[in-house]
Regions:
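Bacterial N-terminal signal peptides
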Residues: 10-19
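Boundary/junction segments of secreted and surface-exposed precursor proteins
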Residues: 25-49, 310, 317-327, 332
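Serine endopeptidase catalytic core focused on the charge-relay Asp
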Residues: 26-41, 48-89, 93-94, 103-105, ...
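Short beta->alpha transition motifs characteristic of CBS
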Residues: 111-115, 210-213, 242, 259-267
Length: 335
């Protein structure tokens, strides 16, 4: 089995061309048809979900503009990775290193390997709206400072191996997650709903929203659950890459979050022509992509107003709980 804890690129030469980028450590890939869509091309319900997805940036990659604006520092995807001509999204910018989702009024959920410690927390910025909003348009890389948030503290984090397994060193195949308290309450974006009910099953449809390779936001559906039996995570055939780490994975039917994209197969391959291509597999091929199950951390995510408690059946039996993540006990596990 390939080493799962690795940088986005499989080619050593490509790694040398990434001095300013720090992608998520777990690679991902394309299965069957490439289902990644731009924000503007997605269905309206997917756009609504996308508005609550964030990209993670280093503070040093965000330039302050006056008055009250910011500019994201990016590089050209194709040039930086020496992509072959014709590769999808080749001329777009890259710069984000992880993805995440708003699950409370000041609470973001991501992968545990995206924010490893207090130093990583202090250096990270969470940005809403990094996407291509109009057909023929360019990625939004200049925005108001109100769309940029800092990490105030790590509320809860876990990155560990699957219990009772004989995984090779470095292949932490268990759950991988972090809940991040922001420096202030989010305005203009709504927290997303998570599944607190029945588990997914093999064959259920799922969709991922995030920032593959640090690109502007992409929506990728057309995927299904391959194996839900793993401890702390499930396996799927999602079209994802490094940079997608931390992306929310939604139940295509219910539109609720079912998990967090955390790792997968090789992202890129060297072509005989000497350039880099995206790694592709048959729809049922490859090792699949791993998704932390939302059930392992849902108890630490505040309920949305009007959300039912487990076992409640009547329309009148609704509990409304304030979405204040400050009530959560900070718990930082060792990476």
């Amino acid at each position: 089995m390939k080493n799962l804890i690795k940088t986005t690129l499989s080619a050593a030469a490509a790694l040398l061309m990434l001095p300013i980028l720090s992608f998520a450590e777990e690679a991902k890939s394309i299965y069957g048809e490439d289902n990644r869509l731009e924000y503007f091309a997605a269905a309206q319900d997917m756009k609504t979900l996308s508005d609550s997805v964030v990209s993670f940036w280093k503070a040093t990659s965000i330039e302050t503009l006056n008055p009250g604006g910011v500019k994201l520092k990016t590089v050209n995807f194709g040039d930086r990775l020496n992509l072959c001509p014709g590769e999808k999204f080749r001329e777009q910018p890259i710069g984000a290193f992880c993805s995440g989702s708003l699950v409370g009024e000041d609470l973001v959920m991501t992968a545990g390997h995206c924010i490893k410690d207090d130093a990583g927390c202090a250096a990270a910025r969470m940005v809403f709206g990094y996407a291509i909003k109009k057909e023929g348009g360019e990625a939004v890389t200049t925005m108001t400072a109100s769309e940029v948030y800092s990490c105030a503290k790590i509320v809860k984090r876990f990155l560990g191996g699957e219990p009772d397994s004989a995984n090779p060193t470095g292949q932490n195949l268990g759950a991988d997650y972090a809940l991040i308290k922001l420096d202030r309450k989010v305005t203009g974006h709504k927290p997303l709903a998570v599944n607190r009910g029945a588990n997914l099953r093999k064959g259920d449809g799922i969709t991922v929203i995030g920032h593959p390779v640090g690109l502007p936001l992409k929506v990728a559906g057309g995927a299904t659950v391959r194996d839900f039996s793993k401890v702390g995570y499930f396996v799927a055939d999602l079209d994802t890459f490094g940079g997608n780490s931390g992306s929310p994975v939604f139940n295509t039917r219910t539109k609720k979050i079912e998990g967090i994209l955390v790792r997968g197969d090789e992202d890129f391959a060297d072509s005989p022509a000497g350039c880099t291509t995206m790694a592709t597999y048959e729809q049922t091929g490859g090792r699949g992509e791993d998704v932390t199950k939302i059930s392992v951390l849902s108890a630490s995510i505040p309920r949305l107003p009007g959300e039912k408690m487990a076992g409640e059946d009547g329309e009148d039996a609704l509990e409304v709980r304030a979405m204040d993540s400050s009530a959560l006990q900070a718990e930082v596990s060792a990476p």
